[in-house]
């Protein structure tokens, strides 16, 4: 990545950390459930909350900084051949047919099926889902499961923060006094409320996509994707049932030979 992208990534990640700790400080400095537990010496709830928050930050940086599944150059592909698809090949019968890979019009690399060039990362990404500006990274074949796990943990932390902010509001004789006394908690409540809605939507969407083995890009742009254009609109050549889809999504590490699955589906349909 070039320097401007690196700087923008640092800016986004710094903003995420600062916002996280500002909200946390507000919750612990006001008379919330977390603060009251701390004052009583009951440290279990504050410690669990802090642990969930720390885990969310660690997962954020994991998803943000890890390789989402960048397509290797031709020379790198030859070197790494035979290392990535062993687990999937044991699950999918070998087919004699083959699908010719196309070259990317931007970076001129051979694109595996379901890969797409990201204009922000300036690289092709395997099983491209989308480019997420909040993590300043693509969500692809290698980090999609971690992205979904991050959404789960972050949603838990945000909802907990929302409830804690609500518990800290204090009454006052007038609206002006109430606003003055609760302004910081009100900001924390508003921020966590917005983020909880966004995270819930993302969580539901990506859980559904994982269960049907589809990506955001395929779902939104099916009519533009060559390998899906001639497939019935209700068909998904990569769908092997909810259990197998979730097992593959969560437990199969490395890259997947999607071409073999696609050929198997086409042969079964004939």
From Swiss-Prot:
What InterPro entries does its record include?
Answer: Palmitoyltrfase_DHHC, PFA4/ZDH16/20/ERF2-like
Please state the Enzyme Commission number of this protein. 2.3.1.225
Q: Which residues form the DHHC domain?
A: 102-152
Signal as UniProt keyword = no
Report the GO molecular function annotations: protein-cysteine S-palmitoyltransferase activity
**Membrane side Lumenal: residue ranges:** 30-45, 167-182
Task: For this UniProt record, give its keywords in alphabetical order, as a comma-separated list.
Answer: Acyltransferase, Endoplasmic reticulum, Golgi apparatus, Lipoprotein, Membrane, Palmitate, Transferase, Transmembrane, Transmembrane helix
Highest taxon of the lineage: Eukaryota
**Entry comment, domain topic:** The DHHC domain is required for palmitoyltransferase activity.
- What family does this belong to? Belongs to the DHHC palmitoyltransferase family.
Q: Which PANTHER family does the annotation name?
A: PALMITOYLTRANSFERASE ZDHHC12, ZINC FINGER DHHC DOMAIN CONTAINING PROTEIN
- What role does this protein play? Palmitoyltransferase that catalyzes the addition of palmitate onto various protein substrates. Has a palmitoyltransferase activity toward gephyrin/GPHN, regulating its clustering at synapses and its function in gamma-aminobutyric acid receptor clustering. Acts as an inhibitor of the NLRP3 inflammasome by mediating palmitoylation of NLRP3, thereby promoting NLRP3 degradation by the chaperone-mediated autophagy (CMA) process.
- Its recorded name reads Palmitoyltransferase ZDHHC12-A
